[in-house]
């Protein structure tokens, strides 16, 4: 409707070429940190005049933004299926790690693996119950015959790291989020015996939606990046 018309009009006036194009993207936090920021940096070095307009949304909101024509592309971080005319493409895998602050230093044992059963009595930090990540963790605990009942629930992934750093509990986050704090020793990784499955960063787009020159070129760039 209106959103598509407004965006279409904006595209026509601005997207004569790659010299002044705009790419509209909806992305989850994890997709941004684990893939998209790096990809945009590389693309920007080739096409410095292309602008990005980024909405930071949940997976569900990002898929809906593509459906409604609000964005050209969505980058999400959950294993999901989409129905035509939407298409999805797996861009890369990523894995979550379990981290702790120094309050629970007894779990820092030179690479020794700890079972989930041993960890379940500790305080836990996680995302809220309606999120895909939380459902993923609930299933992981259930598969290991345990119930996941976090003591603290947060709205976004990037809030988990400071909460862990302040010794409020243990938390799973994508490895990329914790690099600096792991190196500085503010948090440490707990090796868990029961391996958490890898997850995917996924690109979603609408086959029937007319995309800008810049958005098409960005997709082509991402495809070549995989080779």
Where are each of the predicted segments found?
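Alpha-helical "hinge/linker" immediately C-terminal to small N-terminal DNA-binding modules
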Residues: 1-14
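Central regulatory/effector-binding core of bacterial HTH transcription factors
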Residues: 20-82, 154
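A late-sequence structural motif
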Residues: 35, 188-227
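Ligand-binding cleft/hinge of the Venus flytrap
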Residues: 39-48, 116, 134-147
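Hydrophobic hinge/microswitch elements
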Residues: 58-63, 67-71, 77, 136-189
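Flexible hinge/capping segments at coil-to-helix
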Residues: 85-124
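Short beta-strand->loop
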Residues: 87-97, 184-198
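Secondary-structure junction motif
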Residues: 107-108, 122-144, 211-213, 219
